Regions:
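Sec-dependent signal peptide recognition
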Residues: 1-8
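Intrinsically disordered and other compositionally biased segments
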Residues: 7, 17-18
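N-terminal signal peptide c-region/cleavage motif recognized by signal peptidases
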Residues: 13-15
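Central antiparallel beta-sheet cores of small beta-barrel/beta-sandwich binding domains
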Residues: 19-120
Length: 120
């Protein structure tokens, strides 16, 4: 019984600590479906209530664009989160490295529109 409780506490603490490790600002690139890249700042956070949200900002066509992340679902080192800016919205699916210091993944609105990366 003691081994079971110890294992449960270890797994629970690992899950909670992993969640907290994604909090922060990541500097990276967005790549569109034409392989053009744009610098992006991605800010992710998990609230005390366990809600995963954030903001992002990038420059395209001489204009600064920004949006929000909402309704994130975290599983292991994978995060699926939704984004919205002005009249557009879509999804971002990323995978974190072992230390949660960087990520890479894909994004889109209906289909895969390109890649998205970031590093603390």
């Amino acid at each position: 019984m003691f081994k079971f409780i110890t294992l449960f506490v270890f797994l629970l603490s690992t899950y909670v600590l992993a969640d907290e490790k994604i909090n922060g600002i990541y500097i990276g690139e967005i790549e569109d479906k034409y392989k053009n890249t744009y610098p992006v700042t991605t800010n992710l956070e998990i609230t005390d209530a366990g809600v995963i949200k954030g903001q992002y900002e990038y420059k395209y066509g001489g204009k600064n664009w920004n949006g929000i992340f909402y309704d994130g679902k975290f599983s292991g080192k994978d995060l699926l989160i939704y984004w919205k800016e002005e009249s557009r919205q879509g999804w971002l699916a990323i995978n974190f490295d072992e230390k949660y210091a960087s990520f890479s993944g894909t994004w889109g609105s209906t289909n895969n529109n390109g890649n998205w990366s970031g590093k603390k």
